[in-house]
């Protein structure tokens, strides 16, 4: 049996979850399609997903069409959940990208299509909601060519009489994109030689599989119009990326979730081989796991199974496997271009309304962050506040909703702030000597620190001979230095610098690695005080797409948001502005752009890196360490 792992992607409200329900219903996997409006869909399982009609977590379901099994991966549609989408793309054999016939190409559509192109995933466009009033399909095609790709091939005609219908497109002009992309076919066309249809179809299929040509289909997911034709295309056009003739097991974890009873489940894509119940599988050089239970998606449900075949998705209860963990032979994993996840740029304080729920909150955050590595938290041991880093406001709203719905915890959050970093201003050295008050540790440590270029990160070097100071002491110094880099003079992480271990002394037999580990961050802090630090803030590359008449307004508003426009381009009556902007300003800039362009403006961003901060210095409380803070304060008094 052929198995296809299909991603369904779209901007918010394009009808993605409704399409999933319609595919399940039309294929016979379910007796009645669920409704987003009624909250009865199979893939939106969180109440907030049902209430708001948006997908928040990647969901997996499946249907069968003749001898083809299709696993559907229903992905989120909001920008705050891009990390969830990117993880899902790695397991796909193909994708259906929805375009709303009513709303056209949205910002998220462009972002998702860009990711699909980078990973060269074969993609079908499905224009949804064609039965709504006022639809102009030629205008939609034109917008797709201008904003997504000119390499589209419209495979269907949409008729209106006696009622709206979808039929195959037999016009020769539909093949223009195929002919223009192939020199031999173009030469035949220019010389008036006849084509064989098999030649055109073969070239279409080759370019589709390479992710460079995009067939366009039509329908209405809500009314099951055009869905049968879409299923037939999915079953015939997409191929499994599983290597042929390979019996050795290879699988990868792409999703982690917890059940209501707090059981931990991992979702694994099997790339080759077969997984059996009671198999013992190697997951690292030193570690193996035994498969004691597993489920596979089958016809809209999850069923227990004794085997999971190559190409399929399997769900395992497991407390060891992490996101991206490999089961079996890593060499057999397909090579795809890596898409760097966006970094959390915001942080806030989260607290419970009822003090007795604090431990429940901490456990819940541990579980949630386990499935989403971009969500991180720590506890300030002085104030006991819980500090949470995240991507955007919608993500924060979702976290609060999950806490209330799944863990029965009422949480409240403070106004978020941008996550800053620090870099030393100049080179400096500092040494703390053994038996010289107020040093209580049996160790001497001397460090130097100097700034590096932005984006260099932290570089560490030991200039102390191993013959003079053994490896365990040297390792302890490095660990202490890296710990000290977590908090600079203003409480932010230290980066873009070189730190050298210049001098060390120990007394045998009283000195221990702990002495060096605890003293090193104190020495580093004193060196930073001599060097001084500058505050760095995250900057974003941005691309603005807007109708040409809004060019002057976009330029005029840029300085208000500290944005620097570096290039301007006019294309298809649309202006494209590229530049840089502080991350703290982007949300207001986006909102302003949406307002003055009446929703026609699109702003795409990606992290550029950290740059010197503009404006006043923003401090955050230091995270204390009871073992070294007393000594820190003693040195602070001496300064």
Swiss-Prot record:
All copies of the tr-type G domain together span 1-244
CDD domains for this protein: Tet_C, Tet_II, Tet_III, Tet_like_IV, TetM_like
Alphabetized InterPro entries for the sequence: EF-G-like_DII, EFG_II, EFG_III/V, EFG_V-like, G_TR_CS, P-loop_NTPase, Ribosomal_Su5_D2-typ_SF, Ribsml_uS5_D2-typ_fold_subgr
Binding of GTP occurs at: 10-17, 74-78, 128-131
SMART domains per UniProt: EFG_C, EFG_IV
Instruction: Provide an example Pfam family for this protein.
Output: EF-G_D2
By its UniProt entry, which SUPFAM superfamilies does this protein fall under? Answer: EF-G C-terminal domain-like, P-loop containing nucleoside triphosphate hydrolases, Ribosomal protein S5 domain 2-like, Translation proteins
Q: Tell me which family the UniProt entry assigns to this protein.
A: Belongs to the TRAFAC class translation factor GTPase superfamily. Classic translation factor GTPase family. TetM/TetO subfamily.
Protein name stated in the entry: Tetracycline resistance protein TetO
Provide the species name. Campylobacter coli
């Amino acid at each position: 049996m052929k198995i296809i792992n299909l991603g369904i992607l779209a901007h918010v409200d394009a009808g993605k979850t409704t399409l999933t329900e319609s595919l399940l219903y039309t294929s016979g996997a379910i007796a009645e399609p669920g409704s987003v409006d009624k909250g009865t869909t199979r893939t939106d399982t969180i109440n907030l997903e049902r209430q708001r009609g948006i997908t928040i977590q990647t969901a997996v379901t499946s249907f069968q069409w003749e001898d083809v099994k299709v696993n559907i991966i229903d992905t989120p549609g909001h920008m705050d959940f891009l990390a969830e989408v990117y993880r899902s793309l790695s397991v796909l054999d193909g994708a259906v990208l929805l375009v709303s016939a009513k709303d056209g190409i949205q910002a998220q559509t462009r972002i998702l299509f860009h990711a699909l192109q980078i990973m060269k995933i074969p993609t079908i466009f499905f224009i949804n909601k064609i039965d709504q009033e006022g639809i102009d399909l030629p205008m939609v095609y034109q917008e797709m060519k201008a904003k997504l790709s000119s390499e589209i091939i419209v495979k269907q005609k949409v008729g209106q009489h006696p009622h709206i219908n979808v039929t195959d497109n037999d016009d020769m002009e539909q093949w223009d994109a195929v002919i223009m992309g192939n020199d031999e076919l173009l030469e035949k066309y220019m010389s008036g030689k006849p084509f064989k249809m098999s030649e055109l179809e073969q070239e279409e299929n080759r370019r589709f599989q390479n992710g460079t040509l995009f067939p366009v289909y039509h329908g209405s997911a809500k009314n099951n119009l055009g869905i049968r034709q879409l299923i037939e295309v999915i079953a015939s056009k997409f191929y499994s990326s599983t290597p042929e003739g390979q019996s050795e097991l290879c699988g990868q974890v792409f999703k982690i979730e917890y059940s209501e009873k707090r059981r931990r489940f991992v979702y694994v894509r099997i790339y080759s081989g077969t997984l059996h119940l009671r198999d013992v599988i190697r997951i690292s050089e030193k570690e193996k796991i035994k498969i004691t239970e597993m489920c596979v998606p089958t016809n809209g449900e999850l069923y227990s199974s004794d085997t999971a075949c190559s190409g399929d998705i399997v769900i395992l209860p497991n407390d060891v496997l992490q996101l991206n963990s490999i089961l079996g032979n890593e060499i057999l994993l397909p090579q795809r271009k890596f898409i760097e996840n966006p970094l959390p740029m915001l942080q806030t304080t989260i607290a419970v309304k009822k003090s007795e729920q604090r431990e429940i909150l901490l456990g819940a955050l541990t579980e949630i962050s386990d499935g989403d590595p971009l969500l991180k938290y720590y506890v300030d041991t002085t104030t006991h506040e819980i500090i949470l880093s995240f991507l955007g406001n919608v993500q924060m709203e979702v976290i609060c909703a999950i806490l209330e719905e799944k863990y029965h915890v009422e949480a409240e959050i403070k106004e978020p702030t941008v996550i800053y970093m620090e870099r030393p201003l100049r080179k400096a050295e500092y040494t703390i000597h053994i038996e010289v008050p107020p040093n209580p540790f049996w160790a001497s440590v001397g460090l130097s620190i100097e700034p590096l270029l932005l984006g260099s990160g932290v570089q560490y070097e030991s200039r102390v001979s191993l013959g003079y100071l053994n490896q365990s002491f040297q390792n302890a110094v490095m660990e202490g230095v890296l710990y000290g880099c977590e908090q600079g003079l203003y409480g932010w992480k230290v980066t873009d610098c070189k730190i050298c271990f210049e001098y060390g002394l120990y007394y045998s037999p009283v000195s221990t690695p702990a002495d060096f580990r605890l003293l090193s961050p104190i020495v580093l802090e004193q060196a930073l005080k001599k060097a001084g630090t500058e505050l760095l803030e995250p900057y974003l590359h941005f691309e603005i797409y807007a109708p040409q008449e809004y060019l002057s307004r976009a330029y005029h508003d840029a300085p208000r948001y500290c944005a620097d426009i570096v290039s301007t381009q006019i294309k298809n009556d649309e202006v494209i502005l590229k530049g840089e902007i502080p991350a703290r300003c982007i949300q207001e800039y986006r909102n302003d752009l949406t307002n003055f362009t009446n929703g026609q403006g699109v702003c795409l961003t990606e992290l550029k890196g950290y740059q010197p901060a503009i404006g006043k210095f923003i401090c955050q409380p230091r995270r204390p360490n009871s073992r070294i803070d007393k000594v820190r304060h003693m040195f602070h008094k001496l300064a």
